[in-house]
């Protein structure tokens, strides 16, 4: 009986497929000492990048399972290290036996996102690409998946690298002027440095606009439905969801708690929250529901105030509007089928029927407009809030550089800060705490 191999801190293993039962399950191992582990569990080291059908063996040499082994020799692997993938039957017990055998042979259980983190540290992916791995897995729509794949292929990073390169060239001109102050040549004027700075600022704004679309695809928009009881909030939720997500009756106050449903409009996730009708009541349960309604409003991106189209906005609705926080507000005149109105929309009002569906497409368009959504197109890429923050800081430093352009030391420093902000996106400059936060949100097998 073979003795267990000593633990190897640099050898990691994890189940790479989703929990539960399936036809195939994958255990992934990565690290410099994959070879001895492969020999112990397979009886041989498979030929790199070839499919090998074999048995997976326990300590006594008895089979745990049989399946396919794939060996990728460094640096030609996802992590840049030696990688072994064991593809067996997808039952949780079988996969656990294979994983435990790997741990017995000296591997340790991988931390969340550790495979992707190693790929980043070994230069196989930059940080934006590594994040796109998780975004592709979590994509809730075809548009989100396509955008994540573009980021994974490096389109977003290429835009950032281009901006960084332009800043580096501009910084070189400034440094040359500082290093040769007595020369008659004005490097900055000859190279149109200030025109180039303006062009960089325009490019940063364009990239930020695209990144904002990616954030919308990833995070979506939270929309809360508010109004008096029995104005059709639950009916509108059901119409948007396409099924009966909330109970609808003629009895006022049927909805006592918030009801949440996720929908998609042109691939953008919209989180719709139905709330209890806002009114004065002595019912303690309804009071609790109304309190939760206001909590939902505080966290929303858009508040839809529903009113009966036959009555319009009255004193009570005006009070609700006055209490709404600083969010996008749209007044929805529901029940136009009863009031005899036609579907239409103005800047901040919509006339529709949740019951018949008339005018609901106008609402969908308004929600996308409120989100700032533009047609994704072929150039859209996935992005995160931290990317927007970095682009905002870069834009501010570029603007400040223009304000201090004649003070060359300050000009150079603002350009450096803009470059550093952009470099955070791809991970060229990133604190360990940031890396831990990003990769810690990944699943274990990635």
Curated annotation (Swiss-Prot):
Keywords: Cytoplasm, GTP-binding, Hydrolase, Magnesium, Metal-binding, Nucleotide-binding, Potassium, tRNA processing. (6S)-5-formyl-5,6,7,8-tetrahydrofolate binds at residues 28, 85, 124, 446. Its cofactor is K(+). Residues 220-372 form the TrmE-type G domain. It is an enzyme of class 3 (hydrolase). Its EC number is 3.6.-.-. K(+) binds at residues 230, 249, 251, 254. GO terms for cellular component: cytosol. One of its GO terms (molecular function) is metal ion binding. Mg(2+) binds at residues 234, 255. Its main location: cytoplasm. GTP binds at residues 230-235, 249-255, 274-277. It is found in: Cytoplasm. Homodimer. Heterotetramer of two MnmE and two MnmG subunits. NCBIfam families: mnmE_trmE_thdF (TIGR00450), PRK05291.1-3 (NF003661), small_GTP (TIGR00231). HAMAP family: GTPase_MnmE. This is tRNA modification GTPase MnmE. It comes from Thiobacillus denitrificans (strain ATCC 25259 / T1). The gene is mnmE.
